[in-house]
């Protein structure tokens, strides 16, 4: 059997998976290109808004905090909310996976809205816990920020997508 015949047979057998991967790659590239191009219009204002929201929540629970631009200060400890701190790229990745999967546009829209909400809520919790950790145990901040929360957040993204797929395509 010739190699090209085997490849063609494999492609026919795996058509849906190949289609998903191709669409996922395309949608991911488009999402990241749009976010990169809209840096000053979307990303920077989102960072400022997250800093302000963080300040407001901390003040509600009686913690003296302040924010300026994308920086949140809390009792001598400050962090700057930057591109990878705002969940927008993770939401872009999740959205690309949802829209690449074969489902109705209503299922995709609902999955996008609910999933994005979950991811932004988890990210907000991430920001609050990292601020608290930085204030109480500054030496642990870098490891928690760069390793622990990055891994946890990617697991949350994957879990959200798997939960959505399981909801629209229950396993028999």
Stretch-by-stretch model annotation:
Residues 1-172:
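Hydrophobic N-terminal alpha-helices or hydrophobic patches in metabolic proteins across all domains
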């Amino acid at each position: 059997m010739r190699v090209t015949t085997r490849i063609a047979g494999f492609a026919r057998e795996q058509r849906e998976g190949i289609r998903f991967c191709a669409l996922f790659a395309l949608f991911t590239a488009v999402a990241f290109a749009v976010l990169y191009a809209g840096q000053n219009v979307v990303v920077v204002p989102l960072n400022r808004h997250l800093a302000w929201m963080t300040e407001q929540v901390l003040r509600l629970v009686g913690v003296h905090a302040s924010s300026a631009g994308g920086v949140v200060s809390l009792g001598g400890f400050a962090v700057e909310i930057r591109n990878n701190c705002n969940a927008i790229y993770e939401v872009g990745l999740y959205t690309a996976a949802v829209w690449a999967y074969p489902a109705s546009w209503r299922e995709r829209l609902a999955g996008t809205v609910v999933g994005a909400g979950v991811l932004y809520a988890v990210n907000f919790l991430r920001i609050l816990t990292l601020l608290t950790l930085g204030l109480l145990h500054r030496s642990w901040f870098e490891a928690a920020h760069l390793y622990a929360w990055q891994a946890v957040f990617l697991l949350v993204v994957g879990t959200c997508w798997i939960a959505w797929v399981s909801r629209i395509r229950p396993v028999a």
